[in-house]
Every structure is written in C-alpha cells, then in structure tokens.
Amino acid sequence: MTGIYDNKLTSGLEGKPKLIRLLETLRDHATATNLKWAEKLGINPSKSITCVKPEGTTSCLVDSASGLHPRYADYYYRRIRIDKKDPTYNLMKDQGVPCEDDVINPGNTAVFTFAMKAPKGTITTEDLRALDHLDLWKTYQEHY
C-alpha cells in the first residue's frame, strides 16, 4: 500500500475506528486469498501478506504520496541522477529539463531537476506532528 496520506480514510482523518476496520478487512481478505491460492497451487501459504511499500520512483509516476509518508511540501524540487550514456539523458537535456553535472561523478552522471506541485489540500510534513505520524504507523503495524 502506498499514498496513504493522499486519502482521508487511509490517513486516519476520518477517524481511527474507520481506519482500523478498513485495515483489518483488507488484511483478512488478503490472507484468505493467499490461503485459497496456496491450497490450489499446492504450496505453503505466505507468512507475510500485507506491507506498506516504502516507495520512491513509482509514487512519482502515479503522483501519490510515498508509502506511509506525507508529501514534503506544497511545492518542492525532485532531483534524479542519470548516467550520461542513457538515452533518457539526451532526451531530457534536448527537451530543456534543468540539468547539471553530478558533484561526485561529473563525467558520467547528470542530475535533472523537476519542479513539483502537490495536489490541493495535500497533507505535508509541516501539517503533521511526529507523534501523530508514529501513531498512524503503529495502527498499520497492529491492524494491517
């Protein structure tokens, strides 16, 4: 699961009881499905079924918050490193994407910078107290 803070229910904003009910329903369904298919395939069922994906690039591709983390800010820069031999390097450079040489490996690696805007109403790191974030993490650990 990822993009948790992009959804009022999965972020706990609609109340902890609703979130717990959702997480336990999802967990139970995933566990039952795992048992069903393990039996059909004649294999042992998985010991670990559910997870919160830590995320990175995929969340950028689908424009979601990353894993169990809120978005950084309403506006921020996303930077990626690309080998200068990669065809994507020339494509992005030719399209005018801001680019600079990597400090550690300037001869072989480039750093591209993208300006990012979070969706309106997004929960950001400034909106979230650390203890509330830990409490949500604990809820996921206990019920998912």
Predicted feature descriptions by range:
Residues 1-6, 34-37, 132-144:
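Structured alpha-helical segments in the cores of large, soluble enzyme domains
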Residues 47, 60-61:
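Short capping micro-motif at the N-terminus of alpha-helices
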Residues 3, 8-54:
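Internal maturation/activation junctions in enzymes
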Residues 54, 61-144:
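Catalytic alpha/beta core of large soluble enzyme barrels
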